[in-house]
């Protein structure tokens, strides 16, 4: 192993990018920097009411450059010379259209302000009808069921649904695009100077979980399937978009001289393959087989790795894919998740904070900026106070039952038509109690995922949680522990995704021979373990049964044939 070797992990989240420099031998996290996407912060190119969320590629380019340069500037001269690799993870499915030169269309002047020419963020749900069309065709009997290895349901959050939606909606983008690319694959291609779409290495993780790629049918679905779905998918797009895939520990190239100079790092830096944030975060957390890893943020992604012998030829229904090598080579990566977790809390905070925002505007107009500042400070602490107030008197006797479908449902059985539901309100329901219902709802969603695995013979032997909410909100995590009735281990690092990316870079650069070996040196430890409270477990079991009852009652109201207002 190279003494003093350092790798950098890049973690592209929904709001920001994080760069993390890690010592490959000790696992010490040397320096980190977070940079928020400027256009995204201004709300550009997004229409939340229409479920449209887009990222301009310049947000990624500018932010990654700033983040890495800050991290590098804090290292010593000697440390800078020991930077040997960069690993990348991102949200997903977050694809964008590219031209014959591998350029994102939004980087061309004629598409600079066209949201359809940008990255379609994972939580963009504009492609619900297209996802349903994919599911219908897969179940028609005309073709094999190409959804069988991704849980049996294709989601509007995923690759082909988004391509189909944009292609149908925007003729200019449809004519200009020759291929589409996931964010986690584009960044390594950008930094390594790989331009021709056919030369860009596509990650096993994104391809297997979101693009209907599987070796049993030779890669992507055949051209006649895509043509039957819509001829627009075969008119101008290259076919196949790609055939081969690579696991993320494999090198995809060396950084270009231009990028090395811009970032202040050696020209010998190796780029590892890209993968989705939660799969990479699972590696950063040091997870072992049959450990359910909950990566908790605005949403959750739940990852479990299993050996091929136990899964064999079985397909696990209702999840977001089972892919050989999507997490660690040699193991099947199983993915699930909740479409909203922290986003639900944030929505409730915005709802209650509206009056504070309006009052702040009034005070500013009246020449009292100090009062505006005070109100803004109150709003910033609103969720913290709600959590504390509910924790001081966490009565479960009159807890509202909330369905955690505020951004649709990812698992079990993806359905993005679903909406959030709040039940069991009365005139005595106050804000902290209702917020307690929101906390319980996210925990109920977590339990439903665990049961989806266990009910199909996939054991969950351990549960880990990582991310900002996991580390900073013991109240919420204790509710999850009680609802799941399992010990819950909290991972020490709050940047496991970037850490996992650095681990993949260490293997790609040849510092470690494989991912398990690299994990022994670099993965995070456990900060603390929460244990279930037996009395609260029993009460939550009753509430969970009511949650399930409401799920069964509410879901039919959001079917496409329902007369209910969506």
From Swiss-Prot:
Record pathway: Carbohydrate degradation; L-arabinose degradation via L-ribulose; D-xylulose 5-phosphate from L-arabinose (bacterial route): step 2/3
GO biological process assignments: L-arabinose catabolic process to xylulose 5-phosphate
Annotated catalysed reactions: D-ribulose + ATP = D-ribulose 5-phosphate + ADP + H(+); L-ribulose + ATP = L-ribulose 5-phosphate + ADP + H(+)
Keyword Nucleotide-binding annotated: yes
UniProt-recorded Gene Ontology molecular function terms: ATP binding; D-ribulokinase activity; ribulokinase activity
Family statement drawn from the similarity comment of this UniProt entry: Belongs to the ribulokinase family.
Keyword Zinc: no
Cross-referenced InterPro entries: ATPase_NBD, FGGY_C, Ribulokinase
Any one of the GO CC terms: cytoplasm
Protein name per the record: Ribulokinase
Assigned keywords, A-Z: Arabinose catabolism, ATP-binding, Carbohydrate metabolism, Kinase, Nucleotide-binding, Transferase
């Amino acid at each position: 192993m190279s003494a003093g070797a350092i790798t950098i992990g890049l973690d592209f989240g929904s709001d920001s990018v994080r760069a993390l420099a890690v010592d490959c031998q000790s696992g010490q996290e040397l320096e980190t920097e977070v940079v928020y996407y400027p256009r995204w912060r201004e709300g550009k190119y997004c229409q939340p009411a229409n479920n449209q969320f887009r990222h301009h590629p310049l947000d990624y380019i500018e932010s990654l450059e700033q983040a890495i340069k800050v991290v590098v500037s804090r290292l010593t001269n000697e440390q800078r010379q020991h930077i040997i690799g960069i690993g990348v993870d991102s949200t997903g499915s977050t694809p964008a259209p590219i031209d014959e030169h591998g350029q994102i269309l939004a980087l061309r002047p004629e598409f600079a302000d066209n949201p359809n020419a940008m990255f379609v963020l994972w939580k963009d749900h504009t492609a619900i009808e297209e996802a349903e069309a994919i599911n219908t065709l897969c179940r028609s009997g005309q073709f094999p069921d190409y959804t069988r290895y991704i849980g049996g349901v294709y989601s509007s959050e995923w690759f082909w649904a988004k391509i189909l939606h944009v292609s149908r909606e925007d003729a200019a983008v449809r004519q200009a695009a020759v291929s589409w690319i996931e964010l986690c694959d584009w960044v390594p291609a950008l930094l390594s100077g790989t331009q021709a779409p056919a030369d860009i290495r596509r990650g096993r993780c994104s391809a297997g979980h979101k693009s209907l790629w599987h070796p049993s049918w030779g890669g992507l679905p055949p051209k006649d399937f895509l043509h039957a779905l819509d001829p627009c998918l075969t008119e101008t797009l290259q076919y196949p978009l790609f055939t081969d895939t690579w696991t993320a520990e494999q090198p995809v190239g060396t950084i270009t001289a231009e990028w090395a100079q811009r970032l202040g790092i050696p020209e010998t830096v190796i780029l590892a393959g890209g993968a989705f944030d939660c799969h990479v975060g699972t590696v950063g957390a040091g997870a072992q087989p049959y450990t359910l890893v909950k990566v908790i943020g605005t949403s959750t992604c739940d990852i479990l790795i299993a050996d091929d012998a136990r899964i064999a030829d079985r397909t696990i229904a209702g999840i977001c894919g089972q892919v050989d090598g999507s997490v660690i080579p040699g193991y099947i990566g199983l993915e699930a998740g909740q479409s909203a977790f922290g986003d639900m809390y944030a929505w409730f905070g915005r709802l209650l904070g509206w009056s504070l925002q309006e009052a702040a505007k009034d005070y500013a107009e009246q020449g009292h900026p100090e009062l505006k500042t005070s109100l803004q400070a109150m709003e910033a602490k609103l969720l913290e106070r709600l959590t504390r107030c509910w924790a001081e008197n966490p009565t479960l006797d009159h807890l509202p039952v909330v369905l955690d479908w505020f951004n649709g449902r990812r698992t079990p059985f993806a359905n993005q038509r679903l909406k959030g539901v709040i039940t069991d309100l009365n005139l005595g329901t106050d804000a902290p109690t209702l917020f307690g219902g929101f906390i319980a709802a996210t925990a109920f969603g977590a339990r439903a995922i665990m049961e989806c695995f266990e009910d199909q013979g996939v054991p969950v032997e351990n549960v880990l949680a990582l991310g900002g909410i996991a580390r900073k909100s013991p109240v919420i995590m204790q509710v999850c522990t009680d609802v799941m009735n399992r010990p819950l281990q909290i991972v020490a690092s709050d940047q496991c995704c970037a850490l996992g990316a650095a681990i993949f870079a260490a293997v790609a650069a040849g510092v470690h021979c494989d991912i398990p070996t690299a994990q022994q040196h670099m993965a995070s430890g456990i900060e603390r373990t929460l244990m279930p409270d037996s009395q609260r477990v029993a009460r939550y079991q009753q509430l969970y049964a009511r949650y399930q009852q409401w799920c069964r009652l509410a879901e039919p109201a959001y079917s496409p044939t329902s007369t209910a207002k969506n």
